[in-house]
Amino acid sequence: MSLRRTSLTAIVTAALSAVLLTAATVGVAAAQSAVGASRASVPWNRVGAGWVLTQYTSAAPGGRTGPAGLYLISPTGTRYQLARWPNWQLAPQLVAWSPDGQRALFQVFSGQGGAEVLTLATGQVATFVMPGAATPIGFTTPRGLNIVAGQPSGSGTSLARYSLSGRLLQHLGYSADGQVLYAPSGTEFATGTSKGLKLVSNGGALIRNLPVHGMSANSCNPVRWWNSGTILASCVPTNTAIPQLWLVPVSGAHPTALTPRRTVSSGDLGDLDAWQLPSGLYLQAAGPCAVLQIFKQARNGSITLVTVPHTASDNRVLTAFGSRLLIQAPTSCTGSNSLLWFNPATHAEQWLIRAPHNVIGVAAAIPFYSRQNGNL
């Protein structure tokens, strides 16, 4: 688990606009009183692969206010509203979804700040500020029973593990990149170092360094688990600013490059993630003007741009499921974000949320825990 961050129908949009809360409090706790029926209708025993937890707002871009909601979306596109906030500017922001599907983690920016943990099935909320005002990063695996958070330390991040009420449990050491990739078992995690990655126990003890030679200092990020014994990492080679993908064995064996070094002329300004689908190897890549692109890589390393219809060509891949990619993408030039499943081989689309052009739309979307989940 890597730790970081069709339009709504008229009925849902009306519900968001009409059922606003008037309580002075903010955060998840301010959003629970009127959503029990929707929460009660969730088939919790079916929540798993293919489900998505989404925070959506009908506020207009540019710092304007407007309501927001938290939705659980099934693989068939059914939406269940779990929370709502009257003012997006004061709402906590979704950070993570626990691997067991039971809890959501938010970062609070209003008031004294801090973090909130929402139990999705009951609406129970814990709000707290972690020691040192640490910033929440995500949940531990396999069940999400602890929180990982970080504090600035030199040019990197000091990591620690906390209880679900914010109590400090264990210091986890220093990270060069501030990213944490937990093994599915929860016994160890990977994070960045000055020369590649390192594998660390859940108790904070170094297991082994995983160097990736020929890379710039402090440039390697653990992206996700490629298989049970290999980490997919994005690193920047020396004498360039264009990231490259590497397969890094946790055994300490020599890493191998998954993608070749790119040049600006290729149109790929850096490989950030990858998915092996039945139809081929697909890459998440940086593009011009800070957009995200999707490429298909051939066996010889050459690439072909994948165009996602009805989007504004800034396509963030959240996960892969079967033959499809889950994509968060703007659908207008004003920055309105939507959510869809897309099959890059057939170009078939299944829109989960298609936001109107004049709203922010999908502010955050987190797929149910999977080794395929991206970490951008």
Task: Locate each region found by the language model.
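Hydrophilic extracytoplasmic domains
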Residues: 275, 289-376
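Repeated scaffold domains used in trafficking and secretory/extracellular systems
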Residues: 40-43, 89-97, 132-140, 176-184, ...
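Structural motif
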Residues: 59-71, 112-117, 154-160, 194-199, ...
